[in-house]
Amino acid sequence: MDILSVGSATVDVFVHTKESHFNPKSRKIKLDIGSKVLVDHIFHATGGGGTNTAVAFSRLGLKAGFLGKLGKDEAARMIIDEMKEERVNTSLVSRSDVQTGYSVILDAAKEDHVILCFKGANDEFKATDIHESRMKAGWFYIATMMGDAYKAIEKLVEYAAANEVKVAFNPSTYLASKGPKYLEKVLRHVTVLVLNQDEARLIIGKKKVKELAVKLRELGPKIVVITDGPGEIVAYNGTIFYSAKPNKVKIVETTGSGDAFASGFVAGIIKTEDVEFALQLGMANAENVIQALGAKNNLLRLGQALKYMRKHRVSVKKSVK
């Protein structure tokens, strides 16, 4: 395998309600107790950082695998079937008696949503689910994991360091809030770190973006990428700062956009070792995903991505530290 994605797997149900339930001032969705809320439409898809990125890597031409934990239910079958259709290796997936992860994504006003998340079998992932002798990959992509599952990630990263496997890491707000000490065993072996500004500040503190990138790189990562939703993305490799702003596109749903960008960026690094190209590939992937429901539906194949990048060219600025 070129890359093994490690992380969560879920079945997502997107539930869209009338915009009147959303208060843009308070940024809250109001649902009255005892009321019956009419739903405009429902859409089912698979999700989770592990499976989203595995499919993205496969579509971008890499030999990809998924390592995670599923239940023994219909949701697990749905996920495995889709992974096989997308040519993702699932031989390392383990099973639990706990139900497969499930999310309800409540959309109330265009791109605004609330996610109700049942972690389920994802939180059952443990070090004993890692079979080192079968993990032949050049890269590990690690999406966020919590509790005992994160302890398993620490073991995985130790294996990577001892076997010259490169690591890409995309932590969540939950992990970032734990601080640098909690993350140090992973961060010191990371090649590519991708996170958003809020997560970066939870780890480092309230600093400007370029300073965040410098401080994060001092913790171990070779390349640090900090995103800001539709705002400017900054990448830093220890010598050069790269910055770019995504194209404005019509947003349908933002779920999975972070996974799409991160996987596109990492795929770009694997293929070319060029940060500028990787940024453009990541943005192309994310810009397409947010134009459709579901975290995987609009993930691009490599040919589609290159065509999109030529048509919607993004300027990447460079500056030396």
Give residue spans per PLM region:
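Glycine-rich phosphate/adenosyl-contacting loop at the front of the ribokinase-like
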Residues: M1-L67, R77-M78
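Conserved phosphate-binding/catalytic region of the ribokinase-like
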Residues: I3-L4, V13-T17, A176, K210-K321
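Alpha-helix C-terminal capping segments
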Residues: A54-K63, D107-A108, G268-T272
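Beta-strand->loop->alpha-helix junctions that form or flank phosphate-binding loops
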Residues: G68-K72, S91-Q99, V224-D228
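Conserved phosphate-binding/catalytic loop of the ribokinase/pfkB sugar-kinase fold
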Residues: S91, R95, I105-Y150
